Amino acid sequence: MREILHVQAGQCGNQIGGKFWEVMCDEHGIDATGNYVGNFHLQLERVNVYYNEASGGRYVPRAVLMDLEPGTMDSLRSGPFGKIFRPDNFVFGQNGAGNNWAKGHYTEGAELIDSVLDVVRKEAENCDCLQGFQICHSLGGGTGSGMGTLLISKIREEYPDRMMLTFSVFAVPEGSDTVVEPYNATLSVHQLVENADECMVLDNEALYDICFRTLKLTNPSFGDLNHLISTTMSGVTCCLRFPGQLNSDLRKLAVNLIPFPRLHFFMVGFAPLTSRGSQQYRSLTIPELTQQMWDARNMMCAADPRHGRYLTASAMFRGKMSTKEVDQQMINVQNKNSSYFVEWIPNNVKSSVCDIPPTGLSMSSTFMGNSTSIQEMFRRVSEQFTVMFKRKAFLHWYTGEGMDEMEFTEVRANMNDLVAEYQQYQDATAVDDHEDEDEDEAMAA
C-alpha cells in the first residue's frame, strides 16, 4: 500500500493535526479508542494509507507529534482522540522556542531532532511502500517554522525520493500574533523552496473571512478554522484512501501541478462551504460545486487569484458523479475565464474523481491551484521583513542563537527571487518564445 507518514510540529501544527485525525477517524469509521465501528467495507480497504494495524485489530494513526513545549501535546492527549495515538510518538522538549526560528532550527530544536528522526525511521520502516510525508506547521512561530523546516531538510537527506507535502499556515497580513513573524516566515520559505515538493498555503485571515462571509459564524474559533483546513487535507488524499474512477496520488499531483521546480506553493479551496444550518435546503450539482470551488472568496490564503494567472490547477471531486460532466465543467471554466490561465500550458487543469463523499455530504470538491498571484503573500511578508531588517530590529534574538546577518540577507534575496519568478511567468506569453527560438536558430546557423 502507498503509505503516508504524518508529522505535526509546534502548537499550530498539533492543533490542525488533532482536527485532521478526527476527520480521518470519522471517514474510516474508527472510534476514539482505535476500534473499527464503521459499516462499510471500503472504509477499511485502504485504511493503512494513514493507519497502522496494532494487535487486537486496533488502528493507530501513523503520526509523529513534536513540539518544544509540552502544553499543546498534553491537551491533545487529554482530548477526545488522545488515546488513539501511539504514546512513543509524542516527542517534546521542555523549554519552548519562544517564537524564535533560530531556537527551533539551530539550538533547542537541534537537540530534540534526533529523537524525532528515530520515531520517523521506526514508522517508515513499518511501511510496505512509503509514498511520502505530510507535515502540518505554521511559519509564524518558532517550533513549527524553525524545527519543522529542520525536520524537512533531515527527512530530505534520508529519503530523497519520497514526496514531501506541507500544510503551511502563513503569517496573517494584518495584526499578527507575533512581532517577529516576518523573520520566521521568510527563513522558513527559504527552506521550503529548497526541500519541500508541494506546499499547501493556508492563512488565518482568509479562513476567518470564509467563516464570517460564507459560513456566517459570528465569532469563529481556531477550532472552526482548523476544521476547514482538515476537510481540505482529507480531500487532497481521498483518492489514496478510497477507490475512484480517476485516481491521483502525491506524485501525480506534483507532476501535474508544478511546471517549474521552485514554484510549488498552491492555493487550496473546498466546496461546498455552506453555513451549518443551510445544507438541507439545497441540492448540490456539479456546476454549483465547480463555480464555488473556483470562487476567489473560497481560497484559504489571502491572495486573490484574479490578480494573477493560473499556471496549473487540480480539482478532486468526491461522490457519485459522471466523469464526463466533471470534465465538461472544467473545460467550461477554462473557456469562460481563459485570460486567467496561461496560454502556454494547454489543458492545465487536472481533475480526479473519488466515489466516496465525505461524511454528511453527497458530493464535494477540493481545489488546488498553482497561481502566480500567490506572490502577493510572499511580497507582503518580504516588505515587513525589510522594514525590520533595515533597522536590525529584534535581530539580537537570532544572532544570540548563533545566526549571522548574512543568512538574513540571503533569505531575503531568495524570497525576492521567488516573487520575481512568479511575476516573470505571469507576464510570459506564448508568442515571445517563438521569436527567441528563431533568433537562436539564426545564431546557430
From Swiss-Prot:
SUPFAM superfamilies: Tubulin C-terminal domain-like (SSF55307), Tubulin nucleotide-binding domain-like (SSF52490). PROSITE patterns: TUBULIN, TUBULIN_B_AUTOREG. Mg(2+) binds at E69. Keywords: Cytoplasm, Cytoskeleton, GTP-binding, Magnesium, Metal-binding, Microtubule, Nucleotide-binding. The lineage of its organism: Eukaryota, Viridiplantae, Streptophyta, Embryophyta, Tracheophyta. CDD domains: beta_tubulin. PANTHER family: TUBULIN. Belongs to the tubulin family. This is Tubulin beta-1 chain. It holds the Pfam family Tubulin. GTP binds at Q11, E69, S138, G142, T143, G144, N204, N226. The gene is TUBB1. Its main location: cytoplasm. Tubulin is the major constituent of microtubules, a cylinder consisting of laterally associated linear protofilaments composed of alpha- and beta-tubulin heterodimers. Microtubules grow by the addition of GTP-tubulin dimers to the microtubule end, where a stabilizing cap forms. Below the cap, tubulin dimers are in GDP-bound state, owing to GTPase activity of alpha-tubulin. It comes from Glycine max (Soybean). Dimer of alpha and beta chains. A typical microtubule is a hollow water-filled tube with an outer diameter of 25 nm and an inner diameter of 15 nM. Alpha-beta heterodimers associate head-to-tail to form protofilaments running lengthwise along the microtubule wall with the beta-tubulin subunit facing the microtubule plus end conferring a structural polarity. Microtubules usually have 13 protofilaments but different protofilament numbers can be found in some organisms and specialized cells. It is found in: Cytoplasm, Cytoskeleton. Transmembrane segments: none annotated. Its cofactor is Mg(2+). One of its GO terms (molecular function) is GTP binding.
